[in-house]
Amino acid sequence: MQSIPIKNVGESRLVDPFQRQYYYLRLSITDQCNFRCTYCLPDGYQPEANKPSFLTLKEIIHLAQAFAEMGTEKIRLTGGEPTLRKDFISIAESIANIDGIRQLAVTTNGYRMAKDVADWKQAGITSINVSVDSLDPKMFHQITGINKFDDVMRGIDRAFEVGYNKVKVNSVLMKNLNDKEFEQFLAWVKHRPIQMRFIELMQTGEMDSFFDRYHLSGQILADKLLKNGWTLQHKSHTDGPAKVFTHPDYAGEIGLIMPYEKNFCASCNRLRVSAKGKLHLCLFGEEGIELRDLLQSHEQQAILQARIFAALQGKREHHYLHIGDTGVRNHLASIGG
């Protein structure tokens, strides 16, 4: 069994061969989604017959405890759409109460926010990311396949009402679809404490033609921001991959996630676990390392942690998107994007 380094205060025991420390776990709790986004699940969620069920609450707790003991400080609940789980609140409460977990985030399509966000806050969710790919209701419907724009907007407003100081909003940048709305998004965050994050469209196995048609480099937006007085901010050790820009005249912020940028992987600090219990070292990587067999009792914790650490020693220095290698993933919904 490979030895795991002793953790000092403020350090993670999860260290890869390139000395990157991992403080952040993206945990998918379901593959199911009720939206049909063109860049993710254009045909809607298709359940796979005779496949394992999603991780149980008990298994999720064992997993989160193991990662927390190894230095993970932030867990993000993803999907699919994580709030479709009937035990979503129980999952959030359980993780929020684990020693060492300082941040518990959720990425959601926002369709339940207006009704449920107060319960999320009470359960211990500290931050929310909402997907809003257009501020035009018709374009929103075209991209998501669902006519829920007004519901999502009400949910964002409700999040501020119940006490969230900031909401992060994700938009997948697509040429000739929503790229013309950049100025509209800027106006939207002028007086709202929203971090508006534009995510470059990423190539996946079954979406090659879509990528070729709609991909647009985020560097175009970065250049525009810098030209107009926006300033790039320093990242903390638990932050995600976004480059965040601020402006003294704006209450909100702009984030850019540009996976094709040089050195994108140099600051990687996050691992992923799928809804069925596989560890993924990279969004564009391998088939995954099975963890579920070691999530059945607390007595398995040391073996579980050793398996996680050993797997991490096989992490690549960077992805290979720049040469068209998208890994084995046909789409990103199965491991939370």
Curated annotation (Swiss-Prot):
One Gene Ontology molecular-function label: metal ion binding
Source organism phylogeny: Bacteria, Pseudomonadati, Pseudomonadota, Gammaproteobacteria, Pasteurellales
Residues binding [4Fe-4S] cluster 1, per UniProt: 33, 37, 40
Reactions catalysed according to its record: GTP + AH2 + S-adenosyl-L-methionine = (8S)-3',8-cyclo-7,8-dihydroguanosine 5'-triphosphate + 5'-deoxyadenosine + L-methionine + A + H(+)
Subunit structure: Monomer and homodimer.
InterPro entries named among the record's database cross-references: Aldolase_TIM (IPR013785), Elp3/MiaA/NifB-like_rSAM (IPR006638), MoaA (IPR013483), MoaA_NifB_PqqE_Fe-S-bd_CS (IPR000385), MoaA_twitch (IPR010505), MoCo_biosynth_MoaA/MoaC (IPR050105), rSAM (IPR007197)
Role this protein plays: Catalyzes the cyclization of GTP to (8S)-3',8-cyclo-7,8-dihydroguanosine 5'-triphosphate.
GO-annotated biological processes: Mo-molybdopterin cofactor biosynthetic process
Residue positions binding GTP: 26, 76, 107, 168, 270-272
EC category name: lyase
Cofactor list: [4Fe-4S] cluster
Pathway: Cofactor biosynthesis; molybdopterin biosynthesis
Gene3D superfamilies hit by this protein: Aldolase class I (3.20.20.70)
Keyword Zinc: no
Residue ranges of domain Radical SAM core in the record: 17-243
Cofactor binding note of this UniProt entry: Binds 2 [4Fe-4S] clusters. Binds 1 [4Fe-4S] cluster coordinated with 3 cysteines and an exchangeable S-adenosyl-L-methionine and 1 [4Fe-4S] cluster coordinated with 3 cysteines and the GTP-derived substrate.
Binding residue positions for [4Fe-4S] cluster 2: 265, 268, 282
Family: Belongs to the radical SAM superfamily. MoaA family.
Protein known as: GTP 3',8-cyclase
Taxonomic source organism: Haemophilus influenzae (strain 86-028NP)
NCBIfam families per record: moaA (TIGR02666)
